[in-house]
C-alpha cells in the first residue's frame, strides 16, 4: 500500500464475552477482564526464560500422555548470531490480547510425527479425536471420530481444516502460557466458546496453513529484548520470491492441546 505502509503500522485485538454466554455472564466477564489485564511485564520475563532455553535447541519434541497419541518433532531454525537473533516471538499483549505465548515458524524439513487431540473446537466446529500426521512439515494423513464413516470424517477435515487443499504445512508452533485463561475455561465449562485469541494461549498449539508473518516476511521484527526474530519463513513461504501463488494458502488454523494431555518427551 503506497499510503499505509505495513512496517509503520500495527493493530491490537481483544475479545470479551456477551450475555448470551450464559447465566454466569457477570462472573465470566469479570474473569475475562482479569485474563485480558494480566501483568504483561511479568509474562515477558517468564516467556523470555522459555525462549532462552528454546533458542539453544535444534528441535522440540511434543508428546501426549494417557490416551493422547501426539508425538511430534518440530524442527527449529538455526541462529547465526545468538546475541542478536532469536527463533521465538515473545507475545505479551502488544498485538494480540491477552498475554501468553511464544511462537515460531518451524523449518518444514525434519518436522514430522503425529498431532492428536481428544476434543478441540476450531472456528466453532467440534472435532473428536482429531489426528494429523506430518512428514517434512506437511500433512500426509488425517482423521477424526466425529462420524461413523471414515470418508465423512476425512471430508469434514478436508473442508474445514485443510480448506480444500490436498495438504497444508505446519505454519506455526507455539507454547501458550496463560494458565489463568485455561482455568477459567474449565471453571465455567466454556472452552468451546473461547475465541482463538484466548484459546490459543491455554496450551501448546500448532497452526496449519500460512505462517504468522505471511505477506510481511521481509519486515524485520524484534522482541522486547531487542533481538530480531529470524524465523519468519519456511520452505513454502520462500516460494513467494518466484511465484506467490505457490507460497500462500490463505488459511491459518490453530490447534491447541490441553495441558492435561501433554506428557514428557
Question: Where do the protein language model's features map onto the residues?
Answer:
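Active-site bordering "gate/hinge" segments
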Residues: 1-110
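Generic beta-strand/beta-sheet core signal
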Residues: 14, 63-65, 77, 118, ...
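Short solvent-exposed loop/turn micro-motifs enriched in small/polar/acidic residues
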Residues: 55, 123-126, 166, 199
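Long, well-ordered mid-to-C-terminal structural blocks that present hydrophobic/aromatic surfaces
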Residues: 105-164
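Active-site lining segments that contact anionic ligands and/or coordinate catalytic metals
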Residues: 110-112, 127-129, 136, 168-172, ...
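Dual-mode signal for accessory low-complexity, basic/Gly-rich regions
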Residues: 141-217, 244
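A hydrophobic, small-residue-rich beta->alpha segment in the mid-to-C-terminal subdomain
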Residues: 202, 217-254
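Conserved small/polar residues in nucleotide/adenosyl-binding loops
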Residues: 265
